[in-house]
Regions:
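N-terminal phosphate-binding loop and adjacent alpha-helix
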Residues: 169-213, 344, 355-360, 448-451, ...
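A glycine-rich phosphate-binding loop feature that marks nucleotide/adenosyl-phosphate handling sites
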Residues: 226-236, 315-317, 409-419, 473-483, ...
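Glycine-rich phosphate-binding loop of actin/hexokinase-like ATP-binding domains
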Residues: 144-145, 150-178, 249-262, 296, ...
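Nucleotide/phosphate-binding catalytic cleft detector across ATP-hydrolyzing
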Residues: 16-140, 145, 157, 191, ...
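Catalytic P-loop NTP-binding/switch module of NTPases
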Residues: 56-62, 161-162, 350, 367-386, ...
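Short glycine/threonine-rich loop-to-helix capping motif typified by GTGT followed
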Residues: 234-249, 469-472, 481-501, 542-551
């Protein structure tokens, strides 16, 4: 692949053996050797490919018009003949804008030049000494159930200045939204406040981190007080918890959230530390289980403008699906669980150095690809991440080590000479797959993947049926989500998470939730259009759909061995 932008890390010795100095100078790298610390924009060099991959930074065309503006003003010295107040001097130059009382309380301006920071052409947010009109920064944040990602954006140019990410600190209260809602319910005195504080603390820490490592020529290091707008995309539960609004109603029938409309408030109101008067814009949701992250993704992928049949799937803990039937949007949410993100797995871990990310079962043994290592090895890893658990389950089914119903075969059912025999292990009556000397894949691990598979595939079929469409009518399947981008088509098809008919129709769109937050930061029009999109998206409650339980049970079955490729 060719690196178009971003830091792909140090060139390895293996790459130097296979690539010429001219190719390396052009930014050409071996994709299997690259372990970036930040998002990359890449160009694939294969002439033939079965799945198109759009870069993590894919952004559709949009009208840049930020709601935060800067204007240079001059405060003149007053005297006995000219006693014009500072407030009036500001209004004369800025026009009919609101000047908050909190700003007047601390207004001590000497004669000189200042930079006024104005929100939505109607309210003065801050006054900066000198000419700061070349500098304006914001942050776009994606709050997922499992991870939180923050990007620092130069709002003058639209350039991403840096990123920070971490595991959602709310994991101590539960790995999924329902467990966290249960925590709030069980702790009525302070549960809601605890859930809010851990996420706002994380955001403040990430803003500190990304500012600390970002310097601008002529200005120096960016500080948190330079950030004047923060936009957030998140699922509906995470948005409630961020804003300190009770999410209890989301956890019980009829699953009615406290709010779904966008929210625009001062960041300081919920404890987020940024510039004076900094705004916090939270994107709109559709329902309790189709949140702002999905609205953002649908907007980024321009689903309302499609002139064909497109299925959009955000693969994460919640597993949301949107079907665009020539612009008509139908949606549903399926409880995929955190298995595909490496959680709820006996040896699971996040995608980090030391994690197994790919697995091959061969007659010579189990071959592992481990993040941070250069090629397939049999060295001892730390655990298995989401793409790794999906790969191993695919291989277990391909080699017949698990049946179509997901159960491990019995060691007594195969010959001791069979290359697979030493890979199976009995722990009492429990059967396990021996992946390494230390790590095992249990029946429970397989079941976690199976439940995710059943949830996503059944939602896929249910939406098609609701729209009156067949598999043949489907033109494109877009895979979104920070984790979805790392799940190869071979594993998605091989485990039956997606039907084999769509293998050549897949497009990976990366973290479209964060991209949507970015668009909202850079364009007031994008905010308005997302709000319109959310209003027009239809939601289907799978649990209330006739025949869904039977459909879900059918979708739990794995594909036939003959249908799975290596």
């Amino acid at each position: 692949m060719k690196i178009l932008s971003g830091d792909a890390g140090k060139v390895t010795e293996t790459e130097r053996r296979f690539l010429s100095e001219e190719e390396l100078a052009q930014g050409i790298r071996l994709s299997c050797m690259v372990y970036p610390e930040e998002e990359l924009e890449v160009e694939t060099l294969q002439k033939e490919k079965k799945a198109e991959v759009l870069s993590e930074g894919y952004v559709p065309e949009f009208e840049k018009h930020t709601e935060i503006k800067k204007q240079l003003i001059h405060i003149r010295k007053t005297n006995l003949k000219d006693q014009t107040s500072m407030e009036d001097q500001l209004l004369i130059q800025l026009g009919n804008v609101e000047i908050p009382f909190s700003l007047l309380q601390h207004l001590e301006l000497a004669e000189g030049t200042y930079t006024a920071v104005i929100w939505s052409e109607k309210s003065l947010m801050a006054l900066e000494p000198g000419d700061q009109t070349d500098y304006l920064y914001g942050a776009a944040i994606d709050i997922g159930t499992t991870t939180v990602v923050t990007s620092l954006i130069d709002m003058m140019t639209g350039k991403e200045m840096g990123t920070a990410s971490r595991i959602n600190a709310q994991k101590e209260f539960g790995l999924d939204v329902l467990t966290r809602i249960s925590y709030e319910t069980e702790h009525p005195e302070d549960g809601k406040e605890h859930l809010q504080k851990v996420i706002t603390d994380s955001i403040n820490e990430m803003l500190d981190e990304v500012c600390r490592k970002t310097e601008v020529p002529g200005k120096g290091r960016i500080e948190k007080h330079d950030i004047y707008e923060i936009t957030v995309a998140a699922n509906c539960t995470m948005m409630h918890m961020l804003l300190g609004v009770s999410a209890r109603s989301i956890g019980r029938a009829p699953y009615a959230p406290a709010f779904v409309k966008s929210k625009n408030l001062r960041a300081a109101e919920i404890g987020i530390q940024a510039g004076e008067g900094a705004r916090l814009y939270c994107l709109p949701s559709v329902s309790a289980y189709i949140g702002a992250d999905i609205v953002a993704g649908a907007y980024v992928c321009e689903l309302r403008k499609q002139q064909k049949n497109v299925l959009f799937i955000d693969i994460g803990t919640n597993g949301e699906i949107v079907f665009s039937d020539h612009g008509r949007l139908l949606s549903c949410s399926c409880a995929a669980g955190p298995a595909l993100e490496g959680m709820n797995i006996s040896s699971g871990m996040r995608a980090a150095a030391g994690a197994i990310e790919d697995v091959k079962i061969t007659e010579q043994g189990v071959k592992l690809q481990i993040i941070g290592q250069e090629e397939y090895r049999q060295e001892e890893p730390e655990g298995v991440c989401g793409s790794g658990i999906l790969a191993v389950v695919k291989e277990l089914r391909r080699t017949g080590l698990i049946r179509k119903d997901g159960a491990f075969i019995k060691p007594k059912d195969i010959s001791e000479e069979d290359y697979r025999y030493p890979m199976l292990e009995l722990d009492g009556r429990k059967r396990k797959f021996k992946m390494t000397e230390r790590l095992r894949i249990t029946q429970g691990d397989v079941r976690q993947v199976q439940l995710a598979k059943g949830a996503i595939l059944s939602g896929f079929y249910a939406l098609l049926k609701k729209a009156g469409r067949t598999m043949e009518d489907l033109d494109q399947v877009m895979i979104a989500g920070q984790f979805g981008a790392h799940l190869p088509a071979e594993s998605l098809i091989g485990t039956g998470i997606l039907p084999k008919e769509v293998k050549d129709k897949l497009i990976y769109v990366g973290n479209s939730s964060k991209t949507g937050a970015y668009l909202a930061l850079m364009s007031g029009k994008a905010k308005q259009e997302m709000e319109e999109l959310a209003h027009h998206m239809e939601y289907m409650e799978l649990g209330a759909t006739e025949g869904y339980e039977r459909l879900f049970a059918d979708c739990l079955m794995f594909p036939d061995e003959s249908e799975i490729t290596e």
